[in-house]
């Protein structure tokens, strides 16, 4: 129960209401920590078996199409064994990987060559860019002062991203949902059929599992690869690895998933294209048409055309070698866009990904992080560093995996005794008396 609801306090109330069991918040958190530590140990043993080549798959048949997406979250931590209260608060990055089997069909032609309607709406794209920039700015501020404002803005941006992503990639088949994903049209019967037909090409999620940890990206790689191997992802005919441009994502992909198609989440280059177009166009009236043209080029796999125009502008607006430019300077904005797009150009062949029936956004992992944050983040909520963070991540992750009821199955099958606490070796009756 403590993995499903917002806090241990809520879990205690639910348990009391539904069962004759009485348990304190502190005792429930002790049990959660114990189970979380054991789940982390089991995950690490699985990773070690994969590295040693002894890990056996647990599914009968390999899937046809799969996607792995990784990203980083943020968890507020505190010093461990420092007494009551929050001591030495610090935001730390959690690593999260989402592994999905997909229901999709390859196609000989690009099933959706035109830019989705939402990316042709200036107010929508402008709001998206502002929200993503707010996440970065407020995230840095929160890291310095321990404020949770960054999480509030992140949730707002996530809500917008969810309205922009292709709905079938989130497992949503309702043609009335996420209307921003298509050009706005009257809700006639004909247009409903048209929207449904346009969505048929998008890959649909079948089964999702996930891996999360507070470890480094180097340590995270084998944990994700082990989960993928257990589900026979490496044997799939079509394989995708999605990320948002963070360097560690592509290092992990190159080391542990070299045969997977690396795909840059389409939403993130949109922010660089939007800001650079406002600089290059020279006027507000010309900026938006240029942005749409560049976004269309990226959507059609022609990022080289965008890079060429950016380089031409940069050549005609040189920067003095000894001058430090402000972040708001147009030359700085164009340079950042050039760097980002050139570094990721090889991961932006979106027409080919769509022909293969693969997703082109990393919304799957962004939505997963939001589900994890429901339990892990909140006002005045901090976790012991590092054990408390790792434990709560594991129990929350166990209830979010869709291949089985992982948490219940583990608790019901774990070795142990009703009379002894494994961590202390004391008799349960002695602990009750001492308490």
Regions found by a protein language model. Give the residues of each.
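Catalytic center-proximal scaffold of phosphoryl-transfer enzymes
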Residues: 1-435
